[in-house]
Amino acid sequence: MSTHNDEQHEAGADEQEHGHPKKPKRIRRWALLVVVLSVAALAWSCVFHGGLTRKPASFLTTSDAVVAVRLGSGWSTLGDDFRYNDYDGWIVLLDADGRGQVAAVNNVLHGDVLWNERGVFYGSSSHDFLTTEAGTQGFERRYYRSDERQRYALPDGALAVVYGDESGYVVNTVHVDGRVTSVENDKTGGPVGQCGSRILAIIDTKEFRVASAAVFAAYAARSGDKKPPTTLTAVVQLNDHDGEEPPVLAVAPEIDGLNSLQHMFACEGDVITMPSVLADEAAASSHGSTSERQRTLVLQRWDLSTGERSIIPVLDEAGNPLELNDEQGVSEYEAIRVGSEYRFVSWGGDAFAVDLTSGQGRHLFSVDVPTSEFPWSFQVTETGVYTLKARGVDRVVTLSYRPWEGGEWRDIFTTRDLAYYLKEGVLTPTLDIQSFALRPGWDGGAQ
């Protein structure tokens, strides 16, 4: 009560002295409190950890960043009993010195990030995000999914993401005008990729029986075979269709021992080509007694205009099949077309170059990745291969570059600032680098 009276007395004295009433101190105190809270909110929204500034995702801009990184659950905790939403998830934008911005984005499995002329495209289980020089937009998904497969830039400027689980693939497309469309493809899976405006998957009827009737009908119509093989392999289109089942574009008998799990194809017109491994149980490997069967590199080629498939052996310089040893593989590669060659590096770090016209192939190099750092993430340009790796002991992150031919790995930058987000916390498990993308046109490693 006395405080209230004192405030009234002070206000009355001010009125007498200046000829007009002053604002009570109580109002001034509230105004000061508002200012303090505003400053605190701003400080909270921009938290500094070394060379990284933590912001809300809506505050992110591409600024001078050259590398976009997706952090989330991965190899380090593959055997742990955690659900995907028990993990943190982050998007990081780094400049050429390893400094930049980081924002919390809910974790997804196999989170992918794409960077093209529209900006940095990434997502959570419920939203997709596009970060540009001007800021970040969010686009709500019609179907919530926790497992991403790959992101693609379409010729008309739209951005698409394939995600899904055991129920099948869903393609979510963010159009240039901001519209979002979604297409469900029940009980689909397997390799995915892009050819022009089409997002495609390669399925087999043994694993994905829901599509069997349509696939067998397509095979019968094209082959006239009244007794089709027991199992068929087909190329289906995942986007831009209205039916309950994806359209069947090509179909052929399944080949035992033909394996390739990919997220991209070489595309030329209506023809897609995918490096694959063909294992022959009857043929002995030339790599010693530890090998149970011969594994050779082949090109799996599908002509979508005729619906036919062909298998092209990849030959070495001596004209022999290019054989792989027990530790080499081609799955989940990152690839680029350089002249007539398709150059790619697998998720295990094996790099190859294959001439798509002649089938001539070369093994370029293999990366000996320490178990504590496995797997590394890769990106490719016409000049060479980039890898972003987190050291197992202290989670120090290094961006390195190696030319396709005639060179060794060279470090571009090393940063300790990501360790804060990658290390195990009190309530959260260890995180990994799920993927990364380079700013279009930036090739700092080659300079």
Please identify what each model-predicted range represents:
Residues 28-48:
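Hydrophobic membrane-insertion alpha-helices, especially the h-region
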Residues 43-53, 78-108, 124-148, 164-189, ...:
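Surface-exposed loop/turn elements that mediate protein-protein interactions on large endomembrane-trafficking
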Residues 47-57, 62-65:
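Short domain-boundary/entry signatures in modular proteins, especially
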